[in-house]
Amino acid sequence: MFSFDLSVYEDLIELELPHCDIDLTSLEWHRYNPRKFVNRFGCSITSLDGNDSGTPDLDSLIEYNREHNTEYQELDFKTPTKHAAPFKFLLDELTCGRSHFLKLGTGGFFPWHRDNDLFTFRVLYTIEGCGSNDLVWVQNDKVLELQNHKWYYCKEIYVRRIHFF
């Protein structure tokens, strides 16, 4: 079991977790935040019911809740999908909420935003296209350097933007 307080650490730290072999051809991609026509797609690792339709788990929860008169929160999306197997060791140890693979195509981006509050953090596993010639992640006025096939802890309290070339 993991027992440490990551909230005291820097904005981004590399974690020593096992390498995951992921067959990208087996993933089912759906438009991420479908109201925005940005070149980005997702595949659910967790969802409300274990299905991987992408609805509503790849949508903006604020917009989805408003349109459908629901009150979904990040932690409601905790049922593993068939794509969760490579991360079972982590899902068994952490209280994970909405989790997904993200694929940004050329020109794909996330504008300046803040996802959650002081008490949440993001665990990232980078697969491919994360070098400085492919991806720029700016957070807390710093460009974060990512590498392929690495695990990272990332604080959620800062505003950030991400661009893929």
Residue ranges and their predicted role:
Residues 93, 116-118, 165:
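Intrinsically disordered, low-complexity regulatory regions enriched in Ser/Pro/Gly/Thr
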Residues 40, 48-51, 104, 126-128, ...:
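Structured loops at beta-to-helix junctions and adjacent beta-edge loops in soluble globular domains
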Residues 126-165:
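Catalytic core of Fe(II)/2-oxoglutarate
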